[in-house]
Regions:
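Radical SAM enzyme core and accessory elements
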Residues: 213-279
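Conserved SAM/AdoMet-binding glycine-rich loop
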Residues: 37-145, 151-156
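A structural motif corresponding to the C-terminal end of an alpha-helix
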Residues: 46-47, 102, 133-145, 171-177, ...
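Acidic/polar loop patches that form or flank catalytic/metal-binding clefts of enzymes
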Residues: 28, 50-52, 79-82, 146, ...
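Flexible glycine/acidic-rich beta-alpha junction loops that bind and position SAM and/or redox cofactors
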Residues: 62, 117-122, 151-159, 175-232
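Structural recognition of alpha->loop->beta junctions
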Residues: 98-106, 163-184, 189
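Catalytic cores of alpha/beta
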Residues: 94-96, 155-171, 196
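Canonical Radical SAM [4Fe-4S] cluster-binding loop centered on the CxxxCxxC motif
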Residues: 1-34
Length: 279
């Protein structure tokens, strides 16, 4: 059993070019860490549950630091997972060690791309060196990882997409790390995303909604830079098949919480041995 909890509403970053979350959640709000810890304790006692899944779009690092310290201080024996944005501040001091000691066993990252030009175009505010160091620390600590990847972001070339795929498939230590998983999604332009307001900046034009999709919140469009829609579709189909042969995938976001149960089931035996082999 894995129960959902919420530490914050909306997204503290709110700058990603592809994201419509600010359109849905106008104001970002973060809860007091102490109140969230109390939720953990209440739910643990009421439902006899020790596994929790943060539903946040991106957990703020300062919140996590306070939350983890409080969990440890009060000796709350739980395991949890949640979604983070790659941040340099996460790598400061012993913050990742603190997360592990508080029960963090899997972190979900919106990597989107392992190409710096594409990340900059996405307005992610992420440097590849942060990705590398975060992944390395997670593997050493025994924190499993999940990566979201995007195929076909406007202006993206085939070679740039392959940078992301090869980052995973050429990294055997990452592939062998317990509980690692990834999902590749085809880019979808949604209403309210920053790209909608200035499509020319991302090399797209003629945004439209097909009549048969009149209730859709997404757009179809034409590209002027990078791959066209046919090339994107073909590449995407090839890559999801390729990834599916090598990487654990999950069909729905919230099934990622099941990864906690997998790790808990195996951690007494093979997990420790596999971590030793990765060192």
């Amino acid at each position: 059993r894995v129960l959902p909890v919420m530490g914050s509403r909306g997204c503290y970053w709110e700058k990603c070019a592809f994201c419509s979350i600010p359109f849905d959640h106008m104001n970002f709000h973060v809860r007091y860490a102490e109140n969230v810890v109390n939720d953990f304790k209440t739910l643990q006692k009421k439902y006899n549950c020790n596994h929790f899944f943060f539903t946040d779009e991106a957990l703020p690092i300062n919140f996590l630091r306070t939350f983890a310290a409080k969990i440890i201080e009060e000796k709350v024996d739980v395991q949890w997972t949640g979604e983070l944005k790659f941040e340099k501040s996460l790598l400061k001091d012993d913050r990742m060690d603190l997360l592990y000691k508080s029960g963090c066993r899997k972190l979900i990252f919106g990597l989107e791309s392992y190409n710096q030009r594409v990340l900059d175009s996405m307005k992610k505010g992420v440097e590849l060196s942060w990705v590398d160091e975060t992944a390395e620390r997670c593997m050493k600590l025994g924190i499993a990882m999940h990566f979201y990847l995007i195929c076909g972001f406007p202006t993206e070339t085939r070679e740039e997409v392959m940078d992301s795929i090869n980052f995973i498939l050429d990294n055997q230590r990452l592939l062998d790390s317990p509980g690692f998983s990834a999902i590749l999604s085809q880019f979808d332009l949604e209403r309210g995303a920053p790209i909608e307001k200035n499509p020319a900046e991302w090399g797209i034009k003629n945004l439209y909604t097909p009549p048969e999709h009149d209730l859709s919140l997404g757009y179809s469009y034409e590209t002027t830079i990078g791959m066209n829609s046919e090339e994107i579709n073909e590449l995407y189909q090839q890559l999801i098949e390729k990834l599916g042969r090598e990487v654990m995938t999950f069909p729905h976001n919230y099934s990622l919480s099941d990864g906690l149960l997998y790790l808990a089931h195996h951690q007494r035996n093979s997990l420790t041995e596999r971590l030793g082999a990765l060192a």
